[in-house]
Amino acid sequence: MHRMFGTDGVRGIANKELTPELAYKLGKAGAYVLTGRCHKPKILVGMDTRISGDMLENALVSGILSIGAEAICVGIVPTPAVAYLTRKYNADAGVVISASHNPVEYNGIKFFNGKGYKLSDELEDKIQYVIESNFKDVSIPIGSKVGRKIMETGEARKAYIEFAKSTIDTDLKDLKVVLDCANGASYVTSVKAFQELGAKVKVINNEPDGININHNCGSTHPENLMKTVVEEGYDMGLAFDGDADRCLAIDEKGNLINGDFIMAIIAKHLKNQGKLYKNVVVSTVMSNVGFDIALKEEGINTIKTQVGDRYVLEEMRKEGYKLGGEQSGHIIMLDYNTTGDGLITALQIACIVKKSGRKLSDIASMMKNLPQTLVNAKVPDDKKKIYMEDEEIVLKIKEIERKLHGCGRVLIRPSGTEPLVRVMLEGEEQGEIDKMAHNLAELIEVKLN
């Protein structure tokens, strides 16, 4: 069975791969699977600012109503707001229509369970099975048993803003902040939260027209934000992506503060307050070695997962850890929300700067990124996972690890989509690791071709 669901719901080019017909089926099957035998189940629906959002929302909601469920439509809100509001409204499930940081032609449909967590693979497979079996044995309500659509846009947005503000214990008066909303879902919520907390706020890229989401702006294109912060003398910049589940920061000197730095800063702050469970942070294998070194010096341990925020969250829930995330700015704080939350991340950073009275560049200096290099080895698809079976390659990796003597690492990852093996090295000397990475990639190509 070809899986309909990827790592972040069902995604594709809107009206071509993710069609209104598919959205209708997902709404109908999702409502059926996720609400069980509830008398009048409720499903909360939110979306980002893409032009295709209205088309897909109408189709999705039709599917939900056709099964007898109520659809609570909260309009344009961040993905983490849907996770929070699903809990607040005691909904049986939540759905967000968004393709996150991807270009405008893409869209996606992602489900949350009643507790605000992304669905397990098993539940996603059940939804797919119901669709592929053409809704066999699914009873269709008529008359008064058909579902209703309930509009909750203003109140729901306000509730999320109040919730986000409640996660910090200080105002932000006298703090000068530039927000880059990526012409996306945070264009109201983030701005209002910072303004209501008293910050002096300049906003860029907060005029969504349905087409300009993520276009040369937001967390994937922070160059304009960096320039604005420096030229206009702001304390910091904060960049969100299209659905605002991630956030990156810019210090007062215009330096990018990525997710590794943000996790390190928040981890140290939480540890100092005695709030970092077991003094552990969960990150992915892509986090820089400098992140591990910085946290080790603070008496904080790091646990690594494979790439993807769902794997970070899995590890956190399994062991009860409270802080985790990715270099890309997906930061999960389970004391507050069940998914990466850009606004909560932004508020934590602003709160730490305000309470410390220090510059963000000074706070971020607790960590130094080690130089990093990435070289692709071209390898046939059927051979790219067997590199560890070759003795010469294994010996070469061990030799490089010895040369790095604990101040660097070798990470080798077969590409999931291309005939490539990615060779990533980190170490203290850029020239040295460039040479070692190229030599290793060449050896992998020779031995596996």
Swiss-Prot record:
Cofactors demanded by this protein: Mg(2+)
Keywords of the record: Isomerase, Magnesium, Metal-binding, Phosphoprotein
Claim: DNA damage is one of the keywords in the record: no
A molecular function GO annotation: phosphomannomutase activity
The enzyme's E.C. designation: 5.4.2.10
PTM comment: Activated by phosphorylation.
Pfam families on file: PGM_PMM_I, PGM_PMM_II, PGM_PMM_III, PGM_PMM_IV
Catalytic activity line of the entry: alpha-D-glucosamine 1-phosphate = D-glucosamine 6-phosphate
Domain of life: Bacteria
Transmembrane parts of this sequence: none
Keyword Metal-binding: yes
Cofactor binding mode and count: Binds 1 Mg(2+) ion per subunit.
Family matches, as PROSITE patterns: PGM_PMM
Entry's Gene Ontology BP terms: carbohydrate metabolic process; peptidoglycan biosynthetic process; UDP-N-acetylglucosamine biosynthetic process
InterPro entries attached to this UniProt entry: A-D-PHexomutase_a/b/a-I, A-D-PHexomutase_a/b/a-I/II/III, A-D-PHexomutase_a/b/a-II, A-D-PHexomutase_a/b/a-III, A-D-PHexomutase_C, A-D-PHexomutase_C_sf, A-D-PHexomutase_CS, Alpha-D-phosphohexomutase_SF
Residue numbers carrying Phosphoserine: S100
Record: active site: S100 (phosphoserine intermediate)
Residues reported to bind Mg(2+): S100, D241, D243, D245
A GO CC term assigned to this protein in UniProt: cytosol
UniProt record similarity statement: Belongs to the phosphohexose mutase family.
Function text: Catalyzes the conversion of glucosamine-6-phosphate to glucosamine-1-phosphate.
Protein name, entry field: Phosphoglucosamine mutase
Organism: Clostridium kluyveri (strain ATCC 8527 / DSM 555 / NBRC 12016 / NCIMB 10680 / K1)
Gene: glmM
